[in-house]
A protein has these predicted regions:
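Short gly/ser-rich anion-binding loops that grip negatively charged ligand groups
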Residues: 88, 134, 277, 281, ...
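The AdoMet/dcAdoMet-binding core of the Class I SAM-like
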Residues: 94, 282, 289-409, 418-422, ...
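Short, contiguous strand/loop micro-motifs
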Residues: 30-31, 278, 384-387, 413-414
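Phosphate/oxyanion-binding active-site loops and adjacent basic polyanion-contact surfaces
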Residues: 137-140, 283-287
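Alpha-helical transmembrane segments of multi-pass membrane proteins
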Residues: 1-244, 255-259, 269-272, 303-304, ...
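Composition- and surface-driven signal marking solvent-exposed, interaction-prone regions
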Residues: 195, 392, 425-426, 469-472
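Soluble small-group transferase modules, centered on the S-adenosyl donor enzyme superfamily
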Residues: 215-274, 280-284, 297, 441-516
Length: 516
């Protein structure tokens, strides 16, 4: 019918005259979708100084982000059917961008008031970090789709094209943030930059729509611009626990008020290492003294060792070995280049032929080690909130065993709390690889009544456990040595961890029970 075709053509022409140019619609969809993914990744790093990076924090941030995307898209589509999208797209972009900026001071102020990293704190900070701005930005793409539709004949191509562009925006933002932005910019810069770019695009879209509609649509309330400005200003004054944001941690070095030359390396929420700048033989942490006791008992005094350290931290033990066993050759494998830089700049780490540092994943480093050359392999990469599971398995321990000499010793620091399922599972895994295994821990831990740091040791040869016990006492420790039947009773029927199944996040109890 000629009349109907002319009418449809007229409708399409009028729609196109008030819609966004195709390239602008693509940019808006790409940006709004990408900003949500930048927020998700940066939001995880933003809350890490207060609650750590664990399976729970990852789950909370991802879960809230997905929920916000779903709610935002649903509400954006519903509003687009009830209200002219041209009135809402620009304000939503500006509001979403302003809140991306504002979450930085909001999380920092909220985090500074928290006293623990319990599940409630994790959920609260994750929600503050992502929910509202992600929902607002996710409402934009369905509105753009509605605005660009000229006729039912184009629905499939318009929806498909803009949906694909939005997905590409999310993919690009994910790779850009994970591989580049995090490496070169602090979290604060990433969030403020992303938010302000989104605000500016929103303002530009508003100007364009006002021109195309004669001022009917595209107005941005001044209050939203003030929110973006206020958020940017507050971002500079909000309290931050970080001296440096590394690729993996919020890191800082704290001076010991009771020891002039003492320094503590704090990563996220935990004290990871203590270094005495003047005396490398001073060992503050009990677990480090326990590992030192193992080295004292398993090798003649002063004899140099060939040692591999999985996890660097403040490099306390390598420095100790260099001081008490001159000629020792230590290779430290540390995954975080930012931590290594802080070691060099603030903790006085000087690399020599006898103390080398390699930036790499410890599991990868283990796989590259030549066979049968190490007298000692030290596992010190396990934290109190999260565990690099790839270092806990039979396959990883087989690599450690391969690197050791025939009478070499593997020793590792573990952290767990009752019911101590992770420690039990790791001991069971060690026993699947090494015939001689022992546990060093306080009596209360061995009784299952308390938690904290423990030290495990293993070898293909029998261990001098009496000498280890004496060395513990020499290090002013009241820790006990558990082996044989006592260790059997402690381990029980704990599962052996493998690369195929290592549920360490579920086994680990990162916090002491209230009142314990």
């Amino acid at each position: 019918m000629p009349g109907t075709e002319e009418a449809l053509t007229d409708v399409r022409d009028r729609t196109r005259s008030t819609a966004l140019p195709d390239w602008v619609a693509a940019v808006v969809t790409f940006l709004s979708s990408g900003a949500v993914l930048v927020l998700e990744i940066a939001g995880l790093r933003l809350i890490a100084p207060y609650v750590g990076i664990t399976l729970q924090t990852n789950t909370a941030v991802i879960g809230f982000a997905l929920a916000a995307i779903a709610v935002g898209a649903w509400m954006g589509g519903a509003l687009a059917d009830r209200t002219d999208p041209r009135r809402l797209i620009a304000p939503l972009l500006v509001a979403g961008g302003a809140l991306v900026v504002a979450v930085l001071p909001l999380v920092r102020f909220a985090g500074s008031l928290l006293t623990g990293a319990d599940a409630g704190s994790v959920l609260l900070l994750a929600a503050v970090a992502v929910v509202v701005p992600a929902a607002l930005l996710s409402a934009v793409p369905p509105m753009v789709v509605k605005l660009q539709l000229a006729s039912l004949a184009e629905t499939g191509s318009v929806v498909g094209r803009l949906s694909g562009i939005g997905t590409l925006g999310g993919i690009a933002a994910t790779f850009l943030t994970g591989f580049l932005l995090v490496a070169f910019f602090p979290t604060s810069g990433i969030l403020v930059g992303t938010g302000l770019v989104t605000v500016l695009v929103g303002v530009a879209v508003g100007v364009l729509l006002r021109r195309r509609t004669g001022g009917v649509a595209g107005r941005v309330p001044p209050a939203l611009l003030l929110l973006a400005l206020a958020g940017s200003l507050l971002a500079w004054v909000a309290p931050s626990q970080c001296q440096a944001e590394t690729a993996y941690h919020c890191a800082r070095v704290v001076a010991d008020p009771e020891r002039d030359t003492g320094r503590v390396l704090v990563l996220d929420t935990l004290r990871h290492s203590y270094v005495d700048l003047a005396d490398p033989t001073y060992l503050e942490f009990e677990y480090v003294r326990a590992i030192a006791a193992v080295t004292d008992a398993t090798a003649p005094a002063g004899e140099p060792l060939s040692a591999l350290h999985l996890g660097g931290g403040g490099a306390t033990l390598p420095r100790y070995l260099a001081a008490v066993r001159p000629g020792t050759e230590s290779l430290v494998i540390e995954v975080d280049p930012g931590v290594v830089e802080m070691d060099r700049e603030q903790l006085g780490l000087a690399e020599t032929d006898g103390l080398r540092v390699e930036v790499a994943d410890a599991r990868v480093g283990l796989g590259q080690e030549p066979a049968g050359e190490r007298d000692l392999v030290v596992g010190d990469a396990f934290g109190g909130l999260s565990v690099p599971w790839q270092l806990t398995t039979v396959e990883a321990l087989e690599l450690a065993d391969r690197a050791l000499t025939d009478d070499g010793v593997y020793v590792a620091n573990l952290i767990d709390h009752p019911p101590l399922d992770f420690v039990r599972a790791e001991l069971a895994t060690l026993r699947a690889v090494f015939p001689h295994v022992a546990l060093l821990a306080p009596d209360a831990v061995l009784a299952g009544e308390d938690g904290g740091n423990v030290v495990v040791l293993a070898s293909q040869q029998s261990l001098p456990l009496d000498a280890v016990g004496a060395a513990l006492r020499d290090q002013d420790l009241t820790w006990q040595v558990a082996s044989g039947e006592r260790l059997d009773a402690f381990v029980g029927d704990a599962e052996v961890l493998t690369d195929d199944h290592a549920p360490v996040d579920q086994l680990l109890t990162p916090y002491a029970a209230p009142g314990s």
